[in-house]
């Protein structure tokens, strides 16, 4: 069993690589022989914007505690609609497992962290690791799968259809348009929804999950997240929901006391999951 101490303070280096042609991965590498646990990081941006640097505040802090963090770019809408980026993240999960030794990491410890729409994407890949629409990209000379040890979800869009209805009510034309640009139809929003997967009773993987969200998040209503957490638990999953009073969407991407507290919770949750066989 790997030893991970969330109170570690380790020097890190940053490496820029590619995990498939034209798609970059930034690896935050702790110094030392390891073996270290590892995380795939999936950024947000309404499935359309931003890149692998978005979650740098959290990624660096996690890496400094002794976790290899691989923050990935992926294909984005509107040129690459659903489920293209889920397939890329599925591949990235397999790639990190297959390359774990290169980063002094243990492939059996690989988890996922995702923020906003990235929380949706990493959740779908983890809940449906063998789905043919997600797992079709070949990874030569590897038999690794996309199952994940645990998930750290930061203000995640785990219910895209419910969020779409919400932004219609609030008149958020930008998110309406970008959601339509990625999914195309409301049927696709429901099919590719972690929340709807649970509501349908679809058989799925349920890795232990921590959700962090601010109560002032106007991007996805907290009650929807609470309903997801309840459904996840009802389906037999281990889930913790930590709400941050008065904090907005994306609050953890800005250095400060609340992002520090969020990262501390993530480290604690990771340590708990990694201590289990």
Regions found by a protein language model. Name each.
Residues 1-277:
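Alpha/beta-hydrolase superfamily serine-hydrolase fold, recognizing
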